[in-house]
Amino acid sequence: MTGPSPVDRARTGSKHHLLTDSSGIPLAISLTGGHRNDVTQLLPLVDGVGPVRGKAGRPRQRADRVLADRGYDHDKYRRELWKRGVKPVIARRSTEHGSGLGRERWVVERTFAHLHNLRRLRTRYERDDSLHLAFMLLGCAVVCQRRLMAP
């Protein structure tokens, strides 16, 4: 996986993109090359989630809001989220650290930590993307099972 720029080719490996609910249950996951921009995966992740069950009544078709770090900051994608009825809560690249977004984003970071506690996902050994994605999906199933079975 190499990018169009010689600078992009230096970034090896892959990136995991994850969308969770407020309790840390993985809802959607994707895999990209290490040289790809994070923001390209924002809309496919949001679109990959079906109806969200919650309180009694009709299930919501989408999440109310999306929290993301600075890698997903782009005005075009913010507008697209608003069009879909999702409030973007994304840190701006120009703001300093300590904006308070981390108080809510820790749930996603904790889910990444649970995934990377599985030795097979911590270091990528597979050359084939589909095989690595399969292990990521299996890891998400393990995280869901552990989360749902917790007292």
Please give the residue ranges for each predicted region.
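Basic, amphipathic alpha-helical segments enriched in Lys/Arg and hydrophobic/aromatic residues
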Residues: 79, 83-85, 98-151
